[in-house]
């Protein structure tokens, strides 16, 4: 089991939809979150991509030098750069960070945003271009000389002179709920990612991608992207969830939902269907809460509960085939501690803690006793 955290390069705070309790999205704060994740033993961190975020490559490069074990799941956007340039960037980062790069291939799901970036192709054409991009990108990182002529991309005698630390290339994470997205994942992904839907829907996706990968003669691992709200008791956790959206105005929700309607991402449409923009009945599956998706694009669901309950829900996903979990929570610094301290001991997750927790010395003479953690 791998557990990753999240660097909030699009902003952070105690409440959604308001600047009250907000955090500065700057290098100092990103470094705090990254170093906390590193010290707590998270496998890595995801950095989001898009016009609402700081650039993930520059941010990850800045954070790699101030962390030790933490891996960085960084987005590549086919169509916005040539595969040869992306291959050189990936190889350089992976060497300088000593094998700590993971690649998140993002085809894009907002035609309005993509047009602003100069990309004017349809949903299915984006996946065609992504397939061609990854054909070239993977071959270059394997050390091959590449000549390629496709519908969208062409390369003549392309070479990568300096190989990455990880062979044949840094692991590829890929998400896509549509038929075209799943077929692309089956051909190229090492880890297929889904947003946090109820387990029975996630299981359907896993089965579908597995079948498609088998036809390609490949095996694919599976991951899930979720938020988390964990507290000592169920009551406290649900109160924290309610507080998170307590300052959301109806106009803010309506504006966010209208923006999501223009998107042609199948995964985003599935997220919206879970709550329909309605504040009521947000617990869409036991302990799976869709409140964040009222205003946040992309991952919009959270596991909510006490440590034992949240660990049990994670195990339910693991039992259907999920191996990689990418979590986040508001605010991201505090929630990284909440989750690691309360839930890690209950999971089959081997952390690389940089220092052992000790607690405060008692009476200037005794170390605190170690309590045996429950397992789920």
Swiss-Prot record:
Q: What is its EC number?
A: 1.14.14.5
**UniProt enzyme class:** oxidoreductase
Can the keyword Oxidoreductase be found in this entry's annotation? Answer: yes
In terms of InterPro entries, this protein maps to: Alkanesulphonate_mOase_FMN-dep, Luciferase-like_dom, Luciferase-like_sf, SsuD_RutA_monooxygenase
Q: Which GO terms describe its molecular function?
A: alkanesulfonate monooxygenase activity
Q: Which reaction does it catalyse?
A: an alkanesulfonate + FMNH2 + O2 = an aldehyde + FMN + sulfite + H2O + 2 H(+)
GO:BP terms for this protein? alkanesulfonate catabolic process
Cited Pfam families: Bac_luciferase
Q: Which UniProt keywords apply?
A: Flavoprotein, FMN, Monooxygenase, Oxidoreductase
Family label: Belongs to the SsuD family.
**NCBIfam families per UniProt:** alk_sulf_monoox, PRK00719.1
The free-text function statement in the UniProt record for this protein reads: Catalyzes the desulfonation of aliphatic sulfonates.
Name assigned to this protein: Alkanesulfonate monooxygenase
């Amino acid at each position: 089991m791998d557990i990753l955290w999240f660097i909030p390069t699009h902003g952070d705070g105690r409440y959604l939809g308001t600047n009250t309790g907000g955090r500065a999205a700057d290098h100092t704060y990103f470094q705090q979150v990254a170093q906390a994740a590193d010290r707590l033993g998270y496998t890595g961190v995801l950095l989001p991509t898009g016009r609402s975020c700081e650039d993930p490559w520059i941010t990850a490069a800045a954070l790699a030098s101030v962390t030790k074990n933490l891996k960085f799941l960084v987005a590549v956007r086919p169509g916005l750069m040539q595969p040869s340039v992306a291959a050189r960037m990936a190889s350089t980062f992976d060497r300088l960070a000593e094998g700590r790069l993971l690649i998140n291939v993002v085809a894009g799901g907002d035609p309005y945003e993509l047009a602003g970036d100069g990309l004017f192709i349809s949903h299915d054409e984006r996946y065609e271009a992504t397939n061609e991009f990854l054909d070239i990108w993977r071959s270059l990182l394997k050390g091959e000389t590449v000549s390629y002529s496709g519908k969208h991309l062409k390369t003549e005698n392309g070479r990568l002179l300096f190989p990455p630390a990880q062979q044949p290339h840094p692991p590829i994470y890929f998400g896509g709920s549509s038929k075209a997205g799943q077929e692309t994942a089956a051909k190229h992904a090492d880890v297929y990612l889904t947003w946090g839907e109820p387990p029975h829907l996630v299981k359907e996706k896993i089965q579908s991608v597995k079948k498609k990968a088998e036809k390609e003669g490949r095996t694919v691992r599976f991951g899930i992207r979720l938020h988390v709200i964990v507290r000592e008791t169920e009551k406290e956790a649900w109160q924290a969830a309610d507080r998170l959206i307590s300052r959301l105005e109806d106009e803010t929700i309506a504006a966010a939902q209208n923006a999501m309607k223009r998107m042609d991402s199948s995964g985003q449409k599935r997220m919206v269907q879970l709550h329909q923009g309605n504040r009521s009945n947000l617990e869409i599956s036991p302990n799976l809460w869709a409140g964040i998706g009222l205003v946040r694009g992309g991952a919009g669901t959270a596991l909510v509960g006490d440590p034992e309950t949240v660990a049990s829900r994670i195990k339910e996903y693991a039992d259907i085939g999920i191996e990689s979990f990418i979590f986040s929570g508001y605010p991201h610094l505090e929630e990284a501690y909440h989750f690691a301290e309360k839930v890690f001991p209950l999971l089959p997750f081997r952390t690389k803690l940089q220092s052992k927790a000790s607690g405060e010395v008692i009476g200037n003479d005794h170390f605190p006793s170690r309590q045996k953690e429950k397992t789920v």
